[in-house]
């Protein structure tokens, strides 16, 4: 595996995840704002090629 090529591919994937996730969250908040003023999120990273990969991030965003 060539390290530089892998690094570029990984950065591209992470950029796509970040940009598309932000768009979806902003759309949700505009169209259906949570009544509690807090949006709880969970993001899971899995891979069909690596069944042991199960990385979960949970975060709450205050909308006030």
Feature locations, PLM:
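N-terminal acidic leader/helix
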Residues: 1-19
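N-terminal intrinsically disordered, cationic/polar leader segments
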Residues: 2-8, 27-30, 34-64
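General helical structural elements
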Residues: 15, 26-27
């Amino acid at each position: 595996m060539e390290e530089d090529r892998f690094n570029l591919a990984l950065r591209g994937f992470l950029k796509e995840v970040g940009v598309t996730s932000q768009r979806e969250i902003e759309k949700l908040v505009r169209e259906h704002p949570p009544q509690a003023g807090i949006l709880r999120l969970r993001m899971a990273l899995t891979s069909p090629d690596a069944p042991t990969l199960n990385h979960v991030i949970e975060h709450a965003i205050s909308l006030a």
